[in-house]
Amino acid sequence: METLRHATNATGFPLAREPPPTLIEIRKLSKYYRRGEQIIPVLADVNLDIELGDFVALMGPSGSGKTTLLNLIAGIDKPSSGTIKVGGVDIARLSERDLAAWRASHVGFIFQFYNLMPVLTAFENIELPLLLSNLSRRERRERVGIALSLVGLADRADHRPNELSGGQQQRVAIARALITDPTLIVADEPTGDLDRTTGEEILSLIDQLNRELGKTILIVTHDPKSAEKARRLIHLEKGVLAD
């Protein structure tokens, strides 16, 4: 756990050694899509600060812009206007190449449907983000071993996804999100495909990443029960912050 906390980021993309207290600073953020001559607004003039080490839940009805906002903060998509600064870096102004390098180094992703490679073992799925790093094979194996232990799957390293339960697959996905030691972990409906008991176990594990490793967590959920672990709730209504 300590090794993951203090390890150097794998891709080495430049970022302040000690990120500022406000990790995410969003100003006048808007996103729209064009369909022919029609403009379809998704987010409108969003202003938002998220502190380093916070655990934030984004809530709102379907179509409110939750996942779009998550994707913009994580550098998966770019805004139509406005700024998104993460750790002092205005990611909206980065080239696609630099944005990909920033994303690989500083953001861990957890998805509803796990997104594991079916032909790879749990160990290999977790190791995947490190293969383009300058870490040696021994260093990669050590880091993956720590991550597997952290999520309680040290005895499942050689199992492929079809040999694991849904909850175990999501634990592998969490370990993969953690493996590059990112500052920010984003989770889009991480319990949406799990039963209630397993979902609560996954949320407790995500909460552990926040409390014990200091990871900033941003989670999208429809479920008020799933949002209870968060320290801050942000509500979106028709692309506008409602809180």
Language-model segments: residues:
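ABC-family P-loop ATPase nucleotide-binding domain
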Residues: 1-32, 242-243
